[in-house]
Design a protein with these regions (language model features):
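Structural core segment of the AMP-binding/adenylate-forming
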Residues: 56, 83-156, 542, 548-549
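Conserved AMP-binding/adenylation subdomain of ANL enzymes
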Residues: 204-221, 228-333, 343
Length: 604
């Protein structure tokens, strides 16, 4: 597999097939049953769709948009586009219509692939603005203008392959490392999306370096549930396919829990929010059991934390702790592992800060959670923990082959083969994203994150540079760290820290209303209405006490003095979240400005 180091994403695919044509490369649900696809059949379908696109006139550097939920057709389309030397422009299936319109207007795609008629209806207002745009639905749609069926493209490509057997190899061999592979629009927590231009060499380098660094071996099983519109999941799929790991596509985020039990993955890429939900469910089950069950659960968590603190420093467990861990394993940890399929060897977490508590508990329970770090602009991974070197609280050590340094103001800077080519049609934004150096090759990309290295070379992220809160007393507060702590509460669904230029820090909190209603019933609170619950002083005091407990180790200036409870969850549709579920702080602060002001009236 490694005789020739692939330079493009197409070569990654071809090497994967050459290494095991008959192996089951992909699995997906069809009519409620798992269906497999061999590596050879995958390449055949990619070839047919690629040649079908070629027949339609798609050529090198043409841009092709994909607006679809993750699944095998997403990957086949992506590889087919790349095989032609064309450029994939993914659009999140949850992207607001006005942003879909913006992306289509700026990127000017030759074709738009869409998953379903429902998805087309959702963005119909945007599509009306582009009457000449040809649309390819994955599923047959009876009527509509400028529609080309996916099946017809694939069938036409198969005919062309039969007529000209060498054509696919000729076309795909003309794709080079420096060619543009994808324009990925970062959702951004403010302003319009920016199109990040990534080359084949950018993403190929990242996939190869990540696979080697993490020691991903053939024969593994992956469950894919994060959106392929995001470069993190997409790079992981390129990596897994190349290294002989079977990819299983979850039907949707709502089916992940059931899919895990059926697939029993050895590898997953995940986000902290999923781990937080699993952890909160564990806490709820233990609390509902009461008495001895709750005490055993709490004791087991303490054992997990102590075990992980030692094991991640490569220190042996003392005999007593080893015995305690074996007991806790039988009572609690085995059930937790079963909740994630029972075979997980590593979960790689990215996209947001991972609270140390979660990493310690899962790792101590035998589910190694490896936090990594990166951005769309860096293809995406910059650093990641490994099974052999997993320092909880850090995002790991840098990938081999790239450079990282910390600027004087604490900002993380990076350069190397992973760094993007610039923002599409935005030269000023591109220039602002890099340091000013005499030679372009010497420029450093400015990540916008604040961080530091420990003496052993592990990178720690403290916060987003633009998100740092400076209190009126001149103290800097990292909101994401505090939010991560608060989100561990079984009563908290979402939390946002506020307090810039204020005397103290406060928190806006969306409660977990299912758990809160159960607590309220036990306490004799005579309502289940959301707005009445958050107005009840007993509820406010209880959640504030839980926040105090979870943040007790913070410095005084970092501690939350007041909380404001919200009746509605932050959402993409509501405008408070990006498609990658990052909070748009400015939107939240504007929307709840009156409530925030009330948290600072009348003193502490």
């Amino acid at each position: 597999m490694e005789d020739h180091k692939p330079q493009t994403l197409v070569e990654l695919l071809k090497q994967a097939v050459a290494a095991g044509a008959d192996r089951e490369a992909l699995r997906f649900k069809q009519d409620k049953a798992w269906v497999g696809m061999t590596a050879e059949r995958l390449l055949e379908r990619v070839r047919n769709v690629a040649l079908g696109l070629y027949r339609l006139g798609i050529r090198k550097s043409d841009r092709i948009a994909i607006l679809a939920e993750s699944g095998p057709l997403w990957s086949i389309t992506d590889y087919a586009v790349l095989s032609n030397g064309a450029v994939s422009v993914p659009i999140y299936p949850t992207q607001p219509t006005h942003q879909v319109e913006y992306i289509l207007r700026e990127s000017e795609p030759r074709l738009l692939f869409v998953s379903t008629a429902r998805q087309m209806r959702r963005v119909n207002d945007a599509l009306k603005k582009f009457p000449d745009l040809r649309i390819v639905p994955f599923q047959p749609i009876a009527d509509g203008e400028n529609l080309i069926s996916f099946d017809s493209i694939e069938e036409e490509g198969a005919r062309l392959a039969a007529e000209q057997p060498e054509l696919y190899d000729a076309i795909s061999s003309d794709v080079h490392a420096g060619d543009l592979a994808s324009i990925i629009y970062t959702s951004g927590t403010s302003g319009e999306p920016k199109g990040v231009m990534l080359t084949h060499s950018n993403v190929t380098f990242n996939a190869l370096a990540s696979g080697t660094f993490l020691r991903i071996e053939p024969g593994g099983v992956m469950l894919s549930f994060l959106p392929l519109s995001h470069i993190f999941e997409r790079m992981v799929l390129y990596l897994c396919l190349h290294r002989g790991v079977q990819i299983n596509y979850a039907t949707g985020i709502e089916t992940v829990a059931a899919d895990i039990q059926e697939v029993r993955p050895t590898l997953m890429s995940t986000v902290p929010r999923l781990l937080e939900k699993i952890y909160a469910r564990m806490q709820k089950n233990a609390a509902d059991g009461g008495g001895m069950k709750k005490r055993i659960f709490d004791w087991s968590l303490r054992v997990a934390r102590r075990s992980a603190q030692l094991s991640t420093r490569n220190e042996s467990l003392p005999p007593l702790l080893q015995l305690q861990r074996e007991i806790a394993d039988q009572l609690v940890f085995a059930k937790l592992r079963q909740a994630v399929g029972g075979k997980i060897r590593r979960m790689v977490s990215g996209g947001a800060a991972l609270p140390s508590e979660l990493a310690l508990v899962f790792t101590g329970a035998g589910i190694p959670v490896l936090q990594g770090y990166g951005l769309t602009e860096t293809s995406p991974v910059i650093a990641v923990n490994t099974l052999e070197h997993n320092r909880v609280g850090s995002v790991g050590r840098p990938l081999p082959g790239l450079d990282i340094k910390i600027a004087e103001d604490g900002e993380i800077l990076t350069r190397g083969p992973h760094v993007f080519q610039g923002y599409f049609n935005k030269p000023e934004d591109t220039a602002a994203a890099f340091t000013d150096e005499p030679a372009e090759s010497q420029r450093w990309f400015k990540t916008g994150d604040i961080g530091l290295f420990d003496p052993d070379g592990f990178l720690f992220i403290t916060d987003r540079k633009k998100d740092l809160i400076k209190t009126s007393g001149g103290k800097y507060v990292a909101p994401q760290m505090i939010e991560g702590m608060i989100n561990q509460s079984e009563f908290v669904e979402q939390a946002v820290i506020v307090g810039d230029k204020r005397k103290y820090v406060s928190a806006l909190i969306v409660p977990d209303f299912e758990r809160l209603r159960a607590w309220a019933k036990e306490q004799g609170v005579g309502t289940t209405d959301k707005r009445e619950l958050i107005a009840d002083r007993r509820v406010v005091d209880m959640i504030k006490a839980d926040v105090n407990r979870l943040t007790r180790e913070l410095a005084d200036y970092e501690k939350v003095k007041r909380i404001g409870l919200l009746a509605e969850e932050f959402s993409i549709d509501g405008g408070e979240l990006t498609p990658t579920l990052k909070v748009k702080r400015r939107v939240v602060e504007e929307k709840y400005g009156e409530l925030i002001e009330s948290l600072y009236s009348g003193g502490e």
